[in-house]
Curated annotation (Swiss-Prot):
EC number: 6.1.1.5
Source organism per UniProt: Staphylococcus haemolyticus (strain JCSC1435)
Binding site for Zn(2+): 885, 888, 905, 908
Metal-binding keyword on record: yes
Family: Belongs to the class-I aminoacyl-tRNA synthetase family. IleS type 1 subfamily.
Record protein name field: Isoleucine--tRNA ligase
The entry's keywords: Aminoacyl-tRNA synthetase, ATP-binding, Cytoplasm, Ligase, Metal-binding, Nucleotide-binding, Protein biosynthesis, Zinc
EC primary class: ligase
Aminoacyl-tRNA synthetase in keyword set: yes
Classification lineage: Bacteria, Bacillati, Bacillota, Bacilli, Bacillales
Residues that hold ATP according to the record: 598
Compartments, record wording: Cytoplasm
């Protein structure tokens, strides 16, 4: 008789190979057809909500792995919260205004000079919407679930209107003002930039020491003395109006070979070295404090202009001479200190960074080219003491990667000073996963300057400001709200399509416009004001959402970006942060921790991962990272991830195959009647569930990744599933022992599938559709397993048994190497007490030891001859006695000898009798 036909072998249609690139789109189509996002919301309607507010990615270009990391973690969070019973809507968003889209159109050959502003803006809008569709498709392919049919988009009329109203509220509170201040200016973009749009790169610059003759000594210094300043921006010397010294620092007048120089005493050695002075030739003639030098007058080296000596606390002794070249038109500190002394603000550059007529002999020169002309002129005037070149970290435009300058221009500002303390207080009220996140945003708010919110571009939300005939600014509640209403009805393009008077309320008058003539502001708002208004435009405007959000989660660059602009506008208008909890992730690097770049050939993109391996591999990779810091990806890392995935899949498949004839409605064994080993596994499952839920709650996905592997490898593969084959395949179908194990296997399968569902969204769904008798149509509409108290005494007992079992396995391995046995079923294990452990007494508590050890025979006695000493007893491995049963392959001395039951052990004889 062929006994193979009498075995209850695993049966399942669940394929061994994932085939994810082909399978996943089919699963996603089903979700779409079944309207799963809405069903998930409906299921938890009326429950406590959990709002993760999506920081809008920029609507330009293909997705990179940073996008994938961000969106996948957000999806894991929202799916988990949904399965925990929260009403957790997810509204994805896109940021659509700004220079990159203007540049993209220019690259495509669109000439904005050949069309009206409104026409060009319409093309920008079309381009942005096309980009959104491409990115949307790619996000959905990653398995991200959300309201992609109705995302929030910063160019939508209702969003722009909300932004204008928020602006109006800030204006009402006196937080919006116009001023001429030095701001970061990008000649390459021809626009001002906010701090968030600046990045630092190394730049080679001229480093010069310049002498300024004393003009009026004020009775403090000698008439023939000179102040020495140091600068790395020679082109700003034409704008110099002052020399700043620190009031509390000690300064000295030094005689060097007959020349008299004034510098800070603390820097005298550094200056002497830089200017190659002979140390023996240096004499300190006079000493004074910076306060005593205040109002001394110096002469500009080549212009007929006084350079006033003033006091400023920003002067340090870190570098230079302690006498700081001061040009209020080209530096924030210079501007602030200059205001105290009513100094002129000179900034003789145009939008392209070229000197204007005000620049005199430098007119028409690009500022960087003027460096040489200025140093040549200083040499000619005998004012240049030293010229070197240094490489230093310098601010660059984050879009064009070109250097920026400080340039004083009329700009619109949002006041940070007036709300700074309120924002800092709101940060104190916000929860963070890591302390450094709090410190980072706190310090940025504490140290940041006023926020330049105007941009000299056309693709953006216009500033709702009008001017009267006499130049008065018109920015009232009435006018701003009227503009908001117009934008809501027509979109912001109406600003560029209508005259100013047609954008004002009907019949509007102003004393500054006796003729009824008005003009409008042509600057647009900083894109950070756009996205920073999303709490108003989205959280407060959409019925399914609410303010403040439970979570903002973005890349760590957003501490100075979206996190920063959002809390600024929210505190300014609502008096609180827009988020209760702030979480960030690092950047994605290559396998060696290097930045990805085409030139290095180390770029991996989401599209490639999804097409070659599947979205679930990308998602599993995300869960395997310590995302709070920078993370790594490479082909090798993805291969390792695929191996882990394969192990998970095969384990789930094995369990599916072995519950194919199990019906939980009729076959389940009550917990009290389960075999103790099955109760042990049930409690290990509960332990695993509790820690996994805790890790989800704490956003610790790496811990989940590690614990899943540990549970699968240690508890299931290395023990329970291996041990179980002798029961699941061999025992009679309805045997108590078999149904007991199936009861627990079914529970493990269902609970593990749920616990994996937020991460392996497609695979969990595929397992669910192959799991018999599940009630929900989708695992994503099921609830997470409940955390149940474990039987700790039972776990302690079995944990000790598992440690003893490890010793038995070590002994079996030795016996295998010594050719005593081949397979473990050829073994007889003899165990006894030793000084370490009373194994005989301990093992009396357990039944079916031969099955638990996966051997044919076990003998337990107080003492064992010729045994090896192990931590948990003395162990000897013999070859099993008797003959091998042809059905279960266990060795026995009681093989059947007649007819159908020949060569079977007593157990198999009983089972086969029921089948014959």
């Amino acid at each position: 008789m062929n006994y193979k036909d009498t075995l209850l072998m695993p049966k399942t249609d669940f394929p061994m190979r994932g085939g994810l690139p082909n399978k996943e789109p089919q699963i996603q189509e089903q979700w779409e057809a079944n309207n799963q996002y809405q069903k998930a919301l409906e299921k938890n309607k009326g429950n406590q909500s959990y709002i993760l507010h999506d920081g809008p990615p920029y609507a330009n270009g293909n997705l990179h792995m940073g996008h994938a990391l961000n969106k996948i973690i957000k999806d894991i969070i929202v799916r988990y919260k949904t399965m925990q019973g929260f009403y957790a809507p997810y509204v994805p968003g896109w940021d659509t205004h700004g220079l990159p889209i203007e540049q993209a159109l220019t690259k495509k050959g669109v000439d904005r000079k050949k069309m009206s502003i409104a026409e060009f803006r319409e093309k920008c809008k079309e381009f942005a919407l096309e980009q959104i569709e491409l990115q949307k498709k790619d996000f959905k392919r990653l398995g991200v679930r959300g309201d992609f049919n109705d995302p929030y988009i910063t160019l939508k009329p209702e969003y722009e209107a909300a932004q204008i109203r928020l602006f109006g509220e800030m204006a009402d509170k006196g937080l919006i003002y116009k001023g001429k201040k030095p701001v970061y200016w990008s000649p390459s973009s021809e626009s001002s930039l906010a701090e968030a749009e600046i990045e630092y790169h190394d730049k080679r610059s001229a480093s010069i020491y310049v002498a300024f003759d004393v003009k009026d000594t004020k009775g403090v210094v000698d008439q023939d003395a000179q102040f020495i300043i140091w600068t790395t921006t020679p082109w700003t010397i034409p704008s110099n109006v002052a020399i700043t010294v620190h009031p509390d620092l000690k300064y000295g007048q030094y005689n060097v070979n007959g020349k008299k120089y004034i510098i800070a005493q603390a820097l005298s050695e550094d200056v002497a070295e830089a200017l190659e002075w002979d140390k023996d030739a240096i004499q300190l003639e006079k000493e004074f404090t910076g306060k005593e030098l205040e109002y001394v007058e110096a002469q500009h080296p080549f212009l007929d202009r006084i350079s006033l000596v003033i006091n400023g606390n920003h002067v340090t002794t870190d570098a230079g001479t302690g006498c700081v070249h001061t040009a209020p038109g080209h530096g924030e500190d210079d501007y602030i200190v200059g205001q105290k002394y009513d100094l002129p603000v000179i900034s003789p550059l145009d939008d392209k960074g070229v000197f204007t007529e005000e620049g005199g002999q430098f007119e028409g020169m690009f500022y960087d080219k003027a460096n040489k002309a200025v140093t040549d002129l200083l040499t000619e005037k005998d004012a240049l003491l030293k010229l070197n070149f240094i490489t230093h970290s310098y601010p660059h435009d984050w879009r064009t990667k070109k250097p920026v300058i400080f340039r004083a221009t009329p700009q619109w500002f949002a006041s940070i000073n007036k709300v700074r303390q309120d924002i800092l207080d709101a940060i104190e009220e916000t929860d963070f996963k890591v302390d450094w996140g709090k410190t980072r945003i706190y310090n940025m708010i504490r140290d940041r300057g006023e926020w330049v919110i105007s941009r000299q571009r056309v693709w953006g939300v216009p500033l709702p400001v009008f001017y009267a005939e006499n130049g008065d600014i018109i920015m009232t509640k009435e006018t701003v709200n009227h503009v908001a209403d117009l934008f809501e009805e027509h979109g912001s393009n109406i600003w560029f399509e209508r005259e100013a008077k047609d954008l004002l309320p009907e019949g509007f008058t102003h004393p500054g416009s006796p003729n009824g003539t008005f003009t409008k502001e042509m600057d647009i708002m900083d894109v950070w004001f756009d996205s920073g208004s999303s709490h108003r435009g989205v959280l407060e405007n959409r019925p399914e959402l609410s303010f403040p959000a439970d979570l903002y989660f973005e890349g760590s660059d957003q501490y100075r970006g979206w996190f920063n602009s959002s809390i600024t506008t929210a505190v300014a208008t609502r008096g609180q942060a827009p988020y209760k909890f702030l979480l960030s992730h690092g950047f994605v690097m290559d396998g060696e921790g290097k930045k990805m770049s085409k030139s290095l050939g180390n770029v991996i993109v989401p599209d490639q991962v999804v097409k070659q391996k599947g979205a679930d591999i990308a998602r599993l990779w995300v869960s395997s990272t310590d995302y709070l810091a920078d993370v790594r990806i490479s082909d090798e890392i993805l291969k390792q991830t695929s191996d882990v995935y394969r192990k998970i899949r095969n384990t789930l498949r094995f369990m599916l195959g072995n519950i194919n004839d199990f019906n939980p409605d009729t076959d389940v064994i009550p917990e009290a009647e389960l075999l103790e080993v099955d109760r042990y596994l049930l409690n290990r499952l509960r332990e695993f569930t509790a820690s996994t839920i805790e890790h989800y709650d704490n956003f610790d996905y790496l811990n989940i990744y590690q614990e899943v592997q540990n549970f699968i490898n240690v508890e299931l593969s290395n023990f329970y599933l291996d041990y179980g084959k002798d029961i699941l395949y061999i025992e009679e179908k309805n045997a108590h022992k078999r149904r007991s194990m199936q009861t627990v296997l079914y529970q493990i399968l269902v609970d593990m599938t749920k616990l994996l569902a937020p991460i392996l969204v497609h695979t969990a769904e595929e397992v669910w559709t192959h799991t018999p008798h599940v009630k929900e149509e989708s695992v994503h509409l099921a609830d997470m397993p409940k955390v149940v108290e474990v039987d700790q005494a039972l776990l302690d007992k079995w944990n000790q048994f598992m440690a003893l079992r490890d010793d038995v396995n070590r002994a079996l391995e030795v016996a295998r190497n010594n050719k005593v046995i081949g397979k473990s079923l050829e073994a007889k294990v003899v165990i006894g007490n030793n000084d370490n452990f009373k194994a005989a007494e301990f093992l009396q508590q357990f039944e079916d030891l031969q099955q638990l050890f996966i051997v044919s025979q076990v003998e337990v006695s107080d003492s064992v001859d010729n045994a090896e000493a192990y931590q948990h007893g003395d162990i000897r491995i013999d070859h099993a006695v008797g003959e091998k049963c042809e059905r279960c392959w266990n060795y026995t001395e009681e093989l059947g000898s007649v007819g159908e039951l020949e060569h079977l052990c007593p157990r198999c004889q009983e089972v086969v009798k029921t089948l014959v």
